[in-house]
């Protein structure tokens, strides 16, 4: 199976599919910091390209992929509300248009879990259905897919001339019964435990907790990484009180591990850009989980 990755970022989706045995032929993005990280970690081409450009489809067709994968940027509905989604929503439609024109056998579209509440999704589905794709749709909790993180993400998997929900049972049966914890992942996959029992992750708002235990999955890794603010007031859900010590923020590398990037994955660049690239990425093992179900199905 040969793939092209659209909106590839720093390469989480690409690496997950590679790990499942898919050959990634090329990747496309137009954010330079992420492209530079991608180049440092993959041998195939990554093309700096605005996928709205008129020649984008021809560039993708040249690789003759039988699967297109990608996570078109789409602002979280909880942030955007009912406002016009604008350019980011258009990228979801653009992804659907590209797939319908290139016509690979398969496609995988990843997005924010609450895209199902956005008016853009029915429009994208309509494009895929008109192109002849059967669709499997799932909201996957990454912690049940081998990722130590309660990140919920939307996946739409398309296969030409298939019935809808063709892959649903395979996805459901493969989910882990017990969520992956930070402690278990660091011990089993990183090779050494995290040197703290409690850590701080800057919450989206102070209505949410910021202190977590290694004996649970982390919250969603976002594109910001800040130290514990002076005078931080303990949230009722915090697993420890930072004012009493024993709590620290995670390093950039540790955050990449929670996104299930491997130890040898290179992360060079301005710190804020690297943090953003890590937070934007599809967790490697989440992508690998989906890819493995696809490769198993395709061998039938």
Features from the language model and the residues they span:
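S-adenosyl-L-methionine-dependent DNA methyltransferase catalytic core
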Residues: 1-24, 127-131, 153-300
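Short amphipathic alpha-helical segments
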Residues: 18, 39-40, 80-82, 120-122, ...
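The conserved SAM/SAH-binding core of class I Rossmann-like methyltransferase domains
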Residues: 27-28
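Conserved SAM/SAH-binding beta-strand->alpha-helix loop
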Residues: 31
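Short, conserved SAM-binding/catalytic segment
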Residues: 38-46
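Hydrophobic anchor residue in the Rossmann-like NAD(P) cofactor-binding loop of oxidoreductases
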Residues: 51
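Class I S-adenosyl-L-methionine
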Residues: 54-65, 72-220, 224
